[in-house]
Amino acid sequence: KARIHRIFPIFYDQYAIACFDTEYSTVTEDYPSQASAALKNIPSNSLAKSVLRYDKGFFLFLSGASIKENELNVCVALLSERFPESSVGVSGIHFRMEDADKALHEAIYAARVHKLNRKTLNDPSLYQAYSGIEIYRVLLPLIDNEELQQYSLGLLDPVLEFDAENRGSLLETLLGFVQCSGNLHELSARSGQHENTLRYRLDKIAALTGLNYRKMSDYEQLALAARVYLLVND
């Protein structure tokens, strides 16, 4: 508690944490100072705000007697626009100081998913909320598990070999398909490729792996392998 108070001296009943991963940002000045200065431009906002350096980015700590979603969104959106190349994740709202470590991890995990979505889907959203990362809640804490990684590589090896030998795009198609939650129409719209082209590649993946993306149990295996691959290679 004492450490948390040193980092965040103003602590109200509710709080949320945002993680700004600026690994690929072209901004070279001191991030926390810039972020703090930008937040001062918000004319009226009841939230207490603290900024703390984190790796190549920073954490934004927001606290208030009652956090309103629109106020939280204003703060996060402002800094997302200030650091446009950042991957940004926002934790859930927490109430106990003892849960600060959990909130930090939620923000980090959400930022990592935001990074994946920006890279594979050209996701235009300013940030990713932890509440929306779905299965990644389970995968991220386990991603260093060797058996999980071996499962992914074992399933995807035939696809990787085919792409290497034929300069193919099977893996790229599979990863995009999974990121679109198995929605072929959405993948076509995002990638600019005809559905028949994508369907041909997915059928080729089925022939190589023995897993038919049209069958739910098979799709779930492909999706797990693809998501693990994305996290390991992001």
Predicted features and spans:
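Cytosolic nucleotide-utilizing catalytic cores of signal-transduction proteins
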Residues: 1-234
